[in-house]
A protein has these predicted regions:
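Feature for intrinsically disordered/low-complexity regulatory segments and propeptides
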Residues: 1-88, 92
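Intrinsic disorder/low-complexity polar-acidic segments
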Residues: 87, 94-226, 230, 235
């Protein structure tokens, strides 16, 4: 399947692969979950050999909607359900979250959701509208990852690019106390949002600074002062 997209939704602008459900207005998390085809749960079941012997220490992650095995993981693996990803984003960004895209990749093994941050930022005179990206795997191949990115994720390639180039990101393995780790992520990403806002203000303040003609000439002289005879003959 093109771009490894199993199901997705997008707002207005159709992705290059043409797949998914198009909507005109950003949906709520409840509607986005359904539109993206993510309204299913992962359940863990025992793993058996061909001779019907129990494989200890391992579980199969199974999608409840069609009984598809998404992956085999250790019994220490903690599931993060799709609806928990949306709940996390709702809690972090607050009321009126605008979801841009969300979907399932590689037959449900990987999922993502993309939401607008609540503020636009003006940096060096340019208006920037970054997204909050939440990605998760159900096959045991990767961590839960959350990042701030300007990239509109619509497929495997754009997901990988967004995660690789994100300046602010957070990740969590599917082990230990998952709820505590996700609470920690909220605090980390809240600070990142504040950082972006302050950075935008600082650049805007610098942009407004004007220099007198004399100050400009002083800088030019400083940059282009001829080297002294000692400097020109040294080697």
């Amino acid at each position: 399947m093109a771009a490894n997209v199993e199901s997705m939704f997008f707002v207005r602008e159709t992705p290059w692969h043409g797949l998914g459900t198009k909507v005109q207005e950003a949906p709520t998390s409840k509607d986005a979950l359904i539109l993206a085809g993510l309204d299913w749960h992962v359940v863990q079941e025992p793993v058996y050999t061909g001779q019907n012997e129990l494989v200890r220490g391992y579980k199969a992650n199974v999608r409840d909607s069609d009984r598809k095995v998404l992956g085999v993981v250790t019994d220490r693996y903690k599931i993060v359900q799709n609806e928990e990803a949306f709940s996390f984003t709702d809690a972090l960004l607050g009321e009126g979250v605008r979801y841009e895209t969300a979907g399932s990749l590689q037959g449900g093994k990987s999922v993502w959701l993309l939401a607008h941050l609540p503020h636009e930022y003006i940096i060096s005179g340019e208006r920037i509208s970054p997204y909050l990206l939440f990605s998760n795997t159900h096959d045991g191949s990767g961590a839960v990852k959350v990042a701030i990115t300007p990239i509109r994720v619509v497929c495997c390639n754009t997901l990988n690019l967004a995660l690789q180039t994100a300046k602010r990101s957070w990740s969590m393995n599917h082990t230990g106390n998952v709820k505590d780790k996700m609470e920690e992520a909220k605090n980390t990403l809240f600070l990142a949002d504040r950082y972006m806002e302050e950075l935008g203000k600082e650049f805007e303040n610098l942009r407004k600074i004007t220099l007198s003609d004399k100050k400009v000439m002083d800088y030019i002289c400083l940059l282009y002062t001829s080297p002294s005879p000692r400097d020109s003959t040294s080697s």
